Every structure is written in C-alpha cells, then in structure tokens.
Amino acid sequence: MILLTFKNILSNGISYEKDEDNLETSIVNLKSKKEWLHSQKIDDLLDYFDALGQYWKNNTDKNFGNNLKYVSEFLSRENLVKELKISLRGNISSLDKFVNLFDDNEFSYHAQPRGISVHWIAGNVDVLGIFSVIQALLTKNLCLIKVPKNYSLFKNLILSLKQVSTKKIDGKDLVNCITLIYIDRNDLKNQEILSKNADIRIAWGGKEAVSTILSLKKNFFTEDIIYGPKYSYAILDSEFLKDNLKDSAQKLALDVSIFDQYACNSPHTIFIENDDPNFSIVKKFAKELSNSMESVNRLMLPKSQTSEKKLMEILSLRAEYDFKGEVFASKNMDWTVVYSEDEGLANPCFSRVVFVRPIKNAEEVGKFHNRKIQSIGLGISNLKKQEKRIDF
C-alpha cells in the first residue's frame, strides 16, 4: 500500500486539510483565477497590502508569531512602491499597461505576470516565505505553495488575508489566488508535478533542499528565484564605537534575533577593527551585545521553541569556546555571544548565536569573500574608509 503524501491544505479560499490523489486538479483550479488577478490595478493591490500590513501590525500574537511586526513594515505602501520602482525601471504603471520606455515614444513596455509561482517554503522560519508570496501576488502571479511539515502558522497568515478588505479588493478574492499543499520531501513524483507546472520556481532553504528543487524537471522558460543559504556579517571600527557602542549593540542584537538568523541578512560574525593588543574594545562590545541580546529576548522577541538537535549544537559550541575564547550567554539556550580571536568568518550556528572577533585591518575580510555573502553591516567612522572597506 502506498501512502498518500499530497495534502490539500487550502484551495479556492477553503481550508480542507485532507489527503488527495490528484495534484493536477488543484493546479487547474488555481489557474482559473489568473484572469481575475491579472485584471487588478497595481494601485489597488498596493492599497490592499498596506492595509494588510497594518492589520498584521495590530494583531501580532501567538497565532501569527513574534516576527510579523517586521513583515508588516515591508508591506507599507511607501516601501512596496520603492521596491517596485527598482525592478520596473521607475514606472509601476507598467504592471497595468504599456508605458513609454525612458520617455521614448518609439518604445513601450508592459510588465506581464509569469503565471503560476511555485514556492517551496523552508520549515525553519516559515514566516519568511510570506515575503515571496506577497511579491508574487503584487506582480499578479498566482501562488502554489508547498508548505513545511509544521505549517499552521503559515496557514494562519494566509487565511488572515480574508480579514482585510479595501475599497477595490476583498481579501477573500485574493486568498482564492493561493493554494497551499503539503508534500513529503521524499515524494519526488508530486514534487516534479509542481515543478513542471511552475512558471516561476521560488526555493527557500539550505543547500541540500535547494539543490533537490533545482534538480527537478521544469519547462524551458521557467525561471528560478533562490533564497538559499546566504551569509551576512558586520564590521565596526573602534573610532565609531567610541560614540556608538550601545546603539550599535542594540541594533545588531535586533538583527540577530529577528527570524533567529535564518534570514539571509542576519549577521553571524561581527568584526571589530582594533589595534589594541589587549582587545579591550572588542571584549567591551561583546559584553554590551550580550546585554542587548537579553533585552531583545525579554522585551521584544522572545525565543521560540528550539529543536533538541540545535540545543545540543549550541551547548557543544559554548563548551568549545569556554576554552578558546569567552562566552556570554543566557542561562538557557535563548542566545549566545561568542568572543574569540579566531580569524575569518565563523561557521553559522543560527538560533541567535553570534561571534565577535577582532581584526587588525577591515580590508582583510576581502579574502574571505565569495558568492555566498549577502549583506555587510558597517559602522565605520570615516566615509572614505567605509567605501574602501567594502570595495572588495
């Protein structure tokens, strides 16, 4: 007997939560919503998502998760317009109609939706998947979403779209443009059906998960968007820290804590440019960062449940650096700041574990760079020095 691994969680705006044996039927139903979504005006969609952001901001609770308030900031009309202008050559009206290209009457362009965007959402921080879903809907692409095994939070977020309506858009109609399914990671047959029906494949997750998705057969013109295992870090110099030590520690503690470092732009290593042989400013910063980590965890973003495997990994790492450095940590496993004089970028542990390391000259980090680097946070006292430090 072969167990069904395809579960229809949400389609046609209705929560089903039942096993089914025909994934193609769900896909056909979703495609029927294409015309409605394509007909919506970008201004109306912007109004809707701005209102949704306000709704989420005012209703952040255990049903939606602690990180939602930061997602809501992304949904502000001002931010979404800025993001769209970057991608659409400055004219967001191109999503609705043909517009002149660079004020040239001889050439026009119209940004057409691709069709069905298929999202493989990672299980470690499922709220992050909302970013790609919102952007897909905003550009009028239907969303077929393979959720992780623990999908209740993500499902609650999608269903909450029904609670928001604006003058032109009823959230219930927008939810009809989304289908949620669960497929076992080893069910490559149904995974391939997803892939072959995708006009865009959007993959969230680690290297192994993303590689599996990319290996699936797809149509020739299907495009891939990868939210894979990127790495971010920060560089501060001692001159900058003279006046900004506490403020920098607070901001970095928040960056580390949001999404528990599973977001690509969360720092894992913080370099302090320092010529003091005693590294006093580096140690002082590590201590201040630990105070801020505790405050963020207690007052703003309480740590969510952590797997036993990750707890053991953190415990082992703390024991290692008790001998070769200095560890500032919570009494439990909520957060960990590791000071050491090791060279280079630390291997990421995630789960609010951040490394603070001295570096004699910030330009040295250039030798550690590769395509995996996503973001660099800078706290450099001099603008010219700042530009030089990041031009690797």
Question: Which residue stretches match the model-derived regions?
Answer:
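Conserved small-residue-rich beta-alpha loop and adjacent elements
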Residues: 96-165
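Donor nucleotide-activated moiety binding/catalytic core segment of transferases
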Residues: 102-121, 182-192, 334-350
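Conserved NAD(P)+-binding/catalytic subdomain of aldehyde/semialdehyde dehydrogenases
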Residues: 170-276
